[in-house]
């Protein structure tokens, strides 16, 4: 058992913050570093540092496994059965988990699914999470089809930013890859997000050879006049969705070959390397989970809709927080952070992810 030590600071003669670094050992001789930053007037900020020096300040929370689309790389063709309510986290448990994470230093929370906007009560849930003291950024990843209905409400509920999944600009190919749905619904959703006041919306585009590699330039062109960020993401060999093979895999380097005028901005945004067309209003992000693993900078943990805490996306290690109090959840999260591996295993056609779930059951 690991105990988070608490220090009270009643007076400080120096206006600058003091930083106390604690190293706490558990019975396995593993250790976790906890930075306690003490400010005047007893303000206290906790930062969790794992065994490999990574600051864990980001949590992805999947609130539902169900989706109104059936994307081939995310979900089995026949979809998934709706599970009994008692097997899933309750509204209150999701909020408690967010509170526990924030108490340990998480500052950014992302709501995912499935499709989070099909969850009953999603607006109230977002409002409750955004109201937690310490949440600096609340984001949501959505397929965008329901944003015409919900974008304004999400903004009012405190959601700061949206990522919208869109893998093709061709209506026929959209119908194929999603097995249902309408491209126009997503385009309307992107517009609704803009009207609602969301800025710097990110479009997540999974690169797939033989499917959308001929649309790379078209996606990049969307950034010329609009402040969007197109995020090209390498297809990962995960779950039982679309087959991953060498022909299907497209490295992000292909984007730079097809659009050589893209200029690097010299910095990264999380896991994305950022580029821009000269004079463009928006920008392009390249995310390389396969060709260039970024484990050394991993700052996140994941919580599935059925209450399983995943220290690593590509590991089948999971710890349940369902039915636990907020305090118990916090203890479990500390153990999960200690359990984060230094590196994931290899990812390629011969070495699929060890995640143990389809992406819709993890949170995309």
Task: Place the predicted regions along the sequence by residue.
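Intrinsic low-complexity, disordered N-terminal segments enriched in polar/charged/small residues
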Residues: 12-16, 24
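Short, positively charged and aromatic/hydrophobic N-terminal segments
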Residues: 6, 19, 32-39, 44
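Radical SAM/AdoMet-radical enzyme domain recognition
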Residues: 88-111, 118-233
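A short acidic, helix-capping loop that chelates divalent metal ions and anchors anionic groups
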Residues: 79-84, 170-177, 239-243, 320
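Conserved, mostly hydrophobic/aromatic
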Residues: 63, 67, 111, 140, ...
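Canonical Radical SAM [4Fe-4S] cluster-binding loop centered on the CxxxCxxC motif
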Residues: 51-89, 313
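Auxiliary Fe-S-binding modules of radical SAM enzymes
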Residues: 46-58, 224-225, 235-364
């Amino acid at each position: 058992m690991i105990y988070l030590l608490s220090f009270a600071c009643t007076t400080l003669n120096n206006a600058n913050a003091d930083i106390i670094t604690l190293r706490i050992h558990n019975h396995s001789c593993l250790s976790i570093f906890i930075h306690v930053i003490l400010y005047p007037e007893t303000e206290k900020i906790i930062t969790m540092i794992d065994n490999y020096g990574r600051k864990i300040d980001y949590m992805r929370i999947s609130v539902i496994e169900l989706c109104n689309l059936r994307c081939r790389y995310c979900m089995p063709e026949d979809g998934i059965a709706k599970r009994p309510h008692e097997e899933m986290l309750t509204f209150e448990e999701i909020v408690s988990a967010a509170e526990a994470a924030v108490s340990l230093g998480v500052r950014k929370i992302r709501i995912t699914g499935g499709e989070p906007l099909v969850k009953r009560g999603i607006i109230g849930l977002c409002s409750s999470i955004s109201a937690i003291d310490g949440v600096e950024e609340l984001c949501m990843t959505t397929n965008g089809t329901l944003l015409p209905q919900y974008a304004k409400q999400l903004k009012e509920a405190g959601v700061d930013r949206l990522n919208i999944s869109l893998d093709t600009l061709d209506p026929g190919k959209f119908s194929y890859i999603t097995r249902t749905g309408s491209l126009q619904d997503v385009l309307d959703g992107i517009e609704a997000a803009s009207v609602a006041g969301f800025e710097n919306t990110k479009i997540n585009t999974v690169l797939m050879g033989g499917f959308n590699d001929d649309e790379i330039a078209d996606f990049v062109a969307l950034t010329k006049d609009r402040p969007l960020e197109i995020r090209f993401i390498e297809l990962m060999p995960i779950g039982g969705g679309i087959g991953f093979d060498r022909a299907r895999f497209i490295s992000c380097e292909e984007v730079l070959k097809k659009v050589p005028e893209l200029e690097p901005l010299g910095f990264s945004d999380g896991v994305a390397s950022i580029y821009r067309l000269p004079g463009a209003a928006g920008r392009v992000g390249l995310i390389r989970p396969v060709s260039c693993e970024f484990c050394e900078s991993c700052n996140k943990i994941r919580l599935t809709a059925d209450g399983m805490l995943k220290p690593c996306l590509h590991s089948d290690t999971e710890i349940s927080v369902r039915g636990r109090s907020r305090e118990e959840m916090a203890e479990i999260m500390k153990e999960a952070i200690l359990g984060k591996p230094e590196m994931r295993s290899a990812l390629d056609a011969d070495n699929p992810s060890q995640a143990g779930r389809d992406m819709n059951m993890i949170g995309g």
